[in-house]
Amino acid sequence: MKGSLPAELLEVLERSTTADYVTIDGRGQPVVWPLVPRYQAAEGCIDVTVSRVETDLRVALLFSDAVAMVLVQGTAHPENRGSADEIDVHVLPERVYVWRGSDLDAEPELYDAHVDEVRSAHNEEPEVGHAPPQGGGSVWDERLDALGARHPDAVLAFVGPDGFPFAVRVPVRAERDAGLVLVDADPVGAPIEPGLACLCADAPDRRGFHVLGDLDEDRGVWVLRPHRVADPVHAG
């Protein structure tokens, strides 16, 4: 990865003190929460410390920076750190998506671990599918009313057609009467499909939460039907 990414993008990874980490649980549910990433330039990987929970080895890290929004998809290599509750994970990048200036209307650059650069944002990996929407009605939590006001944006995580988690920071707003969270963007290059999703509203000095539910399209707009709201897990 070090040899393929431009210097200014490597600097984003090096200076970032927070990233949003996405895993997939045994039911195919993506879960995203903020943590402290540790970019290891010499090894070409990103280290994180997470709770000791069984998850898919396909993971993602989203870095939100003024220069660019950078999504790193990779494989997790756990390492026992002698703790009963936590493990260290080395994330080896497979693909890196870059939205310059966090512009969701612009085609992202796609860098692949196997070649220097892929100009198109089209992912060539075979499709393996993902869990379908759970179905059922919305479960509204008063914390959702902060979406669009105290939390004008949030990280939307879902599983792409290749089976890897995908995440992007998007503008959001709550529609209490409809029991929905509206995604006020259709990010170019993001392979969004109906299915299970997780929305994380969390930022410095703003107590956050994450929302698990069904992602679907309603009259040309992506919406999240919430099923559960919880405090995000913070880890180093």
Which role fits each region the language model picked out?
Residues 1-236:
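Binding-site signature for planar aromatic cofactors or substrates
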